[in-house]
Amino acid sequence: MIKNPFISVISQEEKEENKGSVEYQILSFTNKIRRLTSHLELHRKDFLSQRGLRKILGKRQRLLAYLSKKNRVRYKELISQLDIREPKTR
């Protein structure tokens, strides 16, 4: 039984990729976002966690924009693997 599924995903990806790569950073931000989202479902008035969630969402959005400019194919693969919606373009 896996106690925390978020950590198991990171440990599997850790072996394959560099921790400094854009994909790994987006993966770790996505896991943090999912963990914070589940926390906020239980604790709706935790405003510091809400602020942290917004900051992490912004960081991930900037990294996704960078990756989409640099390599569109890797961006599409990562979006489909992590089951993330594409951000709206302005």
UniProtKB/Swiss-Prot annotation:
Example GO BP: translation
Annotated compartments: Plastid, Chloroplast
Keyword Ribonucleoprotein recorded: yes
One GO location term (cellular component): ribonucleoprotein complex
UniProt entry tagged with the keyword Iron: no
SMART domains the record matches: Ribosomal_S15
Keywords: Chloroplast, Plastid, Ribonucleoprotein, Ribosomal protein
Domain of life: Eukaryota
Record-linked InterPro entries: Ribosomal_uS15, Ribosomal_uS15_bac-type, uS15_NS1_RNA-bd_sf
One matching Pfam family: Ribosomal_S15
Family listed: Belongs to the universal ribosomal protein uS15 family.
Family annotation (PANTHER family): RIBOSOMAL PROTEIN S15, BACTERIAL AND ORGANELLAR (PTHR23321), SMALL RIBOSOMAL SUBUNIT PROTEIN US15M (PTHR23321:SF26)
Oligomeric form and interacting partners: Part of the 30S ribosomal subunit.
Protein name: Small ribosomal subunit protein uS15c
Organism of provenance: Nandina domestica
Gene name in the database record: rps15
